[in-house]
Amino acid sequence: MTTTKRAFVRDAWSIARTYWTSEEKWSAWGLLLAVVATNLGTVCTSVGINAWNRSFYNALQAFDTEQIFRQLAIFFVLGSLGITLSVFAVYLQQSLQLRWRRWLTQRYIKAWLSNRAYYQLQLTNGVDNPDQRIAEDINQFTNYVLTLSLGLLISLVTLGSFLFILWGLSGPADIPLGQLGLVHIPGYLVWVALIYAGAGTWFTVKIGRPLVQLSLAGQRLEGDFRFSLARFRENAESVASYGGEPVEVGIFQERLQNICQNFRMIMGRQMRLNWLTQGYAQVAVVFPLLVILPRYFSKQIGWGGLMQVASAFSYVYNSLSFVIARYPDIAAWEAATDRLTRFEEQLFELQAPVSAPRQIVIRRRGPAVGINSLDLDLPDGTPLLRGIRFAPLRGEAVLVTGPSGTGKSTLLRAMAGVWPFGRGEISVGEQNSLFVPQRPYLPLGTLTNTLLYPHLDRNGVPAERLKSVLTEVGLDGLVEELDVVENWSQRLSLGEQQRLGFARVLLASPALLFLDEVTSGLDEPWEARLYSLLRSRSWRPTVISVGHRSTLLRLHDQVFDLTRFIPLRDQVVTPLPSPLSTPIALAGSF
């Protein structure tokens, strides 16, 4: 076995064993035993039908009417049993696959969402289309593991059963080799079947091997194409306002062309493989008859024996030709395994304890909020900000300023615990906090769930309270739609979405609030009104904001300018306008 094959088997087992050793292992193994038992039952009925062939065709040759009808009755019993076992085998296998897929999908989703791994994967471009890997690759993996492994098992059992039958039926062959005389070969049909299937398997693997990489590329390209379509749909209004349809068409056509080009390569390789497999299958129809005819013409076997040998030979070569018949599926399974393995490796790296010397430590003890000697980097390690230190007072509103691209939003993300690239300590205290981006995330569902997100356990909030908050933020037109299920991110404008974000803040009552350009879609009067709503609440949160409007200066107590923390080689020489309030004092510790 080559290194690549060993790695594939190891990776496949690494993914599969998690389920078979999980809390569902007993039900899984029980279902698997039931599937194996029903499939073995179908093999037994096949052996019975093979023996029936001899009796039935001998009766036909002898014009034995009574025996013919007796054999037809036997066939009805064997056929009914075989059909029943086959139906239950498929049903039980699908049930097992469904259970396995559900469990494995939940496992990957938990790992993907744990510790914000999904966000870090997006920042680092670690793997492409993780949603496709979860939705499609897991389905393919579980399906192919069960289908191919059970198919291989049944092929081996069938091979063992019919090799014994074929050995007894084929008899010896005496092959003249000139001066060497006759070579006596017992069970010669068995050796013919082995050679025939072995040659076909070798050529199949040789021709079909490139299908693995082509399948990998195809899955990636299909995922990219679907993502571009979904992204267009989500941003339909922006595209329409720009008149960007020709550009989008060009993007779609380019990605579709890549899919078509890859698929043409698959077609070419599959065509070569089909020439082999189809020719192999057609020759196999008459091949066993040709090799057994000498015994039939010498009257060593009758018509029934001839048909039984042909049937046994077909079972043997079909079992030996498992790789030939299922190679495209094997290639697709290998591709799905590779994609899941790469995905799992990335998730494992993100979940593992950080051993690198550069890391951001979030401390959640004590009442104070502050930063101590924080360095921030870009994902590629490029320095962004150096030596940040500050400690806002409790209940204070701080506006973070600096030139565009300084890292203002990055600082907020680091304080919210979602930006991992850098080194230093951030204290956010024991109080609850909330990060509000420029465009709030509005999940699919009712307006009530959208308002309470992510604290859906607070569904006990009275409807009157929800309506009151909606009215406060200027969304009184939605007060009668609390139970309406809608795609709110498409229905509401940016300004309305930002108002809804403020409503969510008022309901959550966080003690520490991070606001990132949250009023960019609002006019100045509403901007002032919403900030006043926050500052007038009895729980008076500590607010750390990022924004570019000069009107924000009068809505905050302090201004924290990041210019002084830009690495020297990146500092901007042009002075900033003087703030309207006193810069926040640096804190030596917190």
Where are these regions (language model features)?
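A hydrophobic transmembrane-helix motif
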Residues: 37, 41, 45, 50, ...
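Conserved "ABC signature" C-loop
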Residues: 440-487
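Helix-to-loop junction immediately C-terminal to a conserved catalytic motif
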Residues: 416
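Cytosolic ends of transmembrane helices, especially the final helix of ABC transmembrane type-1 domains
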Residues: 208, 212, 223, 240-244, ...
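Membrane-integrated ABC transporters
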Residues: 1-46, 55-75, 89-93, 118-156, ...
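Primarily ABC-family ATPase nucleotide-binding module
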Residues: 126-127, 344-399, 422-429, 468, ...
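An intracellular "coupling" helix at the cytosolic face of ABC transporter transmembrane type-1 domains
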Residues: 138-142, 214-234, 240-287, 329-332, ...
